[in-house]
Amino acid sequence: MSYLVPMVIEQTNRGERSYDIYSRLLKDRIIFLGGPVTDDVANLVVAQMLFLEAEDPEKDIFLYINSPGGSISAGMAIYDTMQYIRADVHTICVGLAASMGAFLLTAGAKGKRQALPNAEILIHQPLIGGGGISGQATEIEIHAKHLLRVKERMNRILAERTGQTIERIEADTDRDRYMTAEEAKEYGLIDEVLEKPNQPKK
């Protein structure tokens, strides 16, 4: 099901200009990752990061995440780009950051990984997509070995990003592990739970 993307109108000294909401947010260095992490989505996110990096490598990029996860290779393309560019990527979870969504949430710059109070974070081991594996025994063995290598690499990165031991990460990702925003902070997946900003006194 497709949704209508809202348009916003901005007044400039040259008259009115209309943007779709995501393009307008991009002007403020905000990227929104909403939905599954697919190759197409990853390409868009990477392209936006590279554009913002070229515009100003000293300014933070804000990546808002509300995602059930998705493709490992697509997610790793986003992860590697986040580490490659000079601009700090500030990650914020709104709603849900599950699986690869949680991995990208914790990949933000240290001290700049946040979640809203009612957000949920889910970590687990890498899954095989497509409803199962079929093929020759040797091909299944190749896929299984590859998945174990991917699992080991992702666990190592999670351990580095959270400060947890590899053994703890392996145990906690063996099955689905849901966390509240506060629990994710205690675990080291994020640095801060965002509360309402201070309101000016009347």
UniProtKB/Swiss-Prot annotation:
GO biological process per UniProt = protein quality control for misfolded or incompletely synthesized proteins
Q: Which reaction does it catalyse?
A: Hydrolysis of proteins to small peptides in the presence of ATP and magnesium. alpha-casein is the usual test substrate. In the absence of ATP, only oligopeptides shorter than five residues are hydrolyzed (such as succinyl-Leu-Tyr-|-NHMec, and Leu-Tyr-Leu-|-Tyr-Trp, in which cleavage of the -Tyr-|-Leu- and -Tyr-|-Trp bonds also occurs)
User: Nucleotidyltransferase among the record's keywords?
Assistant: no
Q: One Pfam family name from the record? A: CLP_protease
InterPro entries this protein is in? ClpP, ClpP/crotonase-like_dom_sf, ClpP/TepA, ClpP_His_AS, ClpP_Ser_AS
PROSITE patterns named among the record's database cross-references: CLP_PROTEASE_HIS, CLP_PROTEASE_SER
Instruction: List the active-site residues.
Output: 99 (nucleophile), 124
Subcellular localization, as worded in the UniProt entry: Cytoplasm
Q: Which GO terms describe its cellular component?
A: cytoplasm; endopeptidase Clp complex
Sorted alphabetically, the keyword list is: Cytoplasm, Hydrolase, Protease, Serine protease
Record EC number: 3.4.21.92
The UniProt GO MF terms for this protein read: ATP-dependent peptidase activity; ATPase binding; serine-type endopeptidase activity
Which top-level enzyme class is recorded in the Swiss-Prot or TrEMBL entry? hydrolase
Q: How does it assemble?
A: Fourteen ClpP subunits assemble into 2 heptameric rings which stack back to back to give a disk-like structure with a central cavity, resembling the structure of eukaryotic proteasomes.
* Family stated for the protein in its record: Belongs to the peptidase S14 family.
- Which PANTHER family does this chain map to? ATP-DEPENDENT CLP PROTEASE PROTEOLYTIC SUBUNIT
Report what the protein is called.
Answer: ATP-dependent Clp protease proteolytic subunit 2
Gene that specifies this protein:
clpP2
